[in-house]
Regions:
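Bacterial N-terminal signal peptides that target proteins for export
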Residues: 1-11
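Short aromatic-glycine motifs in intrinsically disordered, low-complexity regions
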Residues: 28-40
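Secretory pathway targeting signatures of secreted, lumenal, and periplasmic proteins
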Residues: 46-116, 123
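Signature of long, low-cysteine stretches enriched in small and polar/charged residues
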Residues: 112-184
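Surface-exposed amphipathic alpha-helical segments
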Residues: 190-227
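Short conserved aromatic/hydrophobic patches within beta-strands of well-structured domains
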Residues: 37, 41-49
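Bacterial N-terminal signal peptides
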Residues: 9-19
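Sec/Tat signal peptide C-region and signal peptidase I cleavage site
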Residues: 21-25
Length: 227
């Protein structure tokens, strides 16, 4: 992720560029080789691709590797309204869907997907040994995403929960700030996608929320791609 100061500058610049933009929220098809994959954001979120904002695209690019193609970057409806009204958005929750550029034109088999997911998991390390995630994250390097738990492991879905202790801003008596994220690898219509959900982590409600929304988004994407 980019430095917080740069992130805030980009957010401030977006206020002016999005102030007059219209709102649109609907499922859409993304051509990947000879296949079209259906995408949509969960209720309460809006895909931002239609805005055509270079600054917003830069924010999305900060969340993923340059080797991935961004298919969707969604923010909350409330944050989108804030942008368009010229107010400061919270940017506390957001989500992204990507696919490896090297696989855009390739039809991925179940065996290939299993290898891809296993390779991705192998680089995440071991999950936290307890459910006291703040305590676990306090022992990890600031700014580094750490594996907290494996959520699903199925032939076409592999999902994990991660957490990050955010770098200190240097304020006196500053409390630690945490970020939760889920990353899910999905096989949809022969295409390998990675979808991630992010939220600030202040307590159990945020943990419950991200697990629920992740599951709901997985189900939604599988449903609209089974037609």
């Amino acid at each position: 992720m980019m430095p917080r100061a740069r992130w805030l500058l980009l957010l401030a610049a977006l206020v002016l560029s999005l102030a007059a933009a219209p709102v649109r929220a609907a499922a859409f098809l993304v051509p990947l080789g000879d296949t079209r994959v259906a995408l949509d954001a969960p209720p309460g979120f809006a895909d931002t691709g239609f805005l055509g904002s270079p600054r917003l695209e830069e924010l999305a690019q900060s969340l993923t590797s340059a080797s991935n193609r961004i298919l969707l970057f969604a923010i909350t409806d409330g944050d989108l309204r804030a942008f368009m009204n010229g107010d400061q958005p919270a940017m506390r929750r957001y989500m992204i869907a990507v696919t490896p550029r090297s696989l855009v034109r390739h039809s991925v088999s179940l065996d290939e997907f299993a290898t891809l997911a296993a390779d991705a998991l192998r680089g995440l390390g071991k999950p936290a040994g307890s459910a006291d995630y703040p305590k676990f994250l306090d022992r990890q390097p600031a700014g580094q995403a750490s594996l907290l738990a494996e959520l699903r492991s199925e032939p076409e879905v592999v999902s994990v929960l991660q957490g990050t202790r955010m770098p200190s801003q240097g304020g006196y008596g500053e409390k630690p700030h945490y970020l939760l994220s889920t990353t899910t690898w999905l096989l949809l219509r022969g295409k390998a996608l990675s979808v991630s959900v992010y939220t600030g982590y202040d307590g159990p409600a945020d943990l419950a929320w991200i697990k629920y929304v992740t599951q709901r988004w997985i189900d939604q994407l599988q449903r609209i791609n089974s037609r």
